[in-house]
Amino acid sequence: MKMMRGSRLFAGGATRLPCVCATMFACWWLIPLGLPDTSHAQVTPPITSSGLNTHISKPSGNSLQYDITAGTRAGTNLFHSFGDFSVPTNNIANFLNDSGLATSNILGRVTGGNPSNIFGTLQTTGFGGANLFLMNPAGIVFGPNAALNVGGSVSFTTADYLRLTDGARFNAIAGPQDAAISSAPVAAFGFLGSNPAAIAVQGRQLAVAEGQGISLVGGNLTVQGGTLADTT
């Protein structure tokens, strides 16, 4: 497999590309997979936990915010595991630093086999400039009202694992290796097959803070009437 490094932002009507990644990361270059029809994507079920001490507080009353707390720490890395991870329109998925500990990277995986439909807001609270990674091998769709409110860079991937600089892996499937999660930074996105799931951005500008980056790493990337940008 070939390693690719680069930084590219895309805009326009309908753009289809095999892989996008920010300069701070590396990704495995892959054979593209055709994008499934996402025009009628549903946002059910929303967010559930699948281990690693991930806690999710469901909205109550008039609230539309899911607070994601706890998780499993290794140094300044914070790991979360979700059975499903989708954000309905007008809802907020809020990664909340309930411990107050210094955090460099928030790494989340989705294990349930359903795509992540991000139609609301992804947010981090109390993490400063921590980077956010979300890995779902089943696919990721950003709807027309999707938004990011994250202090650091963000990476969305349909990879099967994240490889860290010390050689450790954070796998999309739970297993005994979870006992050896690492404090090292993310070095690469790893795929076990030649047909990774696609990522779609539908009619929305996904923006991050000035000086930060957006990485979309997986199969075909389709940007329909939207842009990827920072706020410079």
Label each PLM-derived region with a short phrase.
Residues 4-5, 26-232:
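Solvent-exposed adhesion/ligand-recognition segments of exported proteins
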Residues 19-21, 27:
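Cysteine-centered motifs
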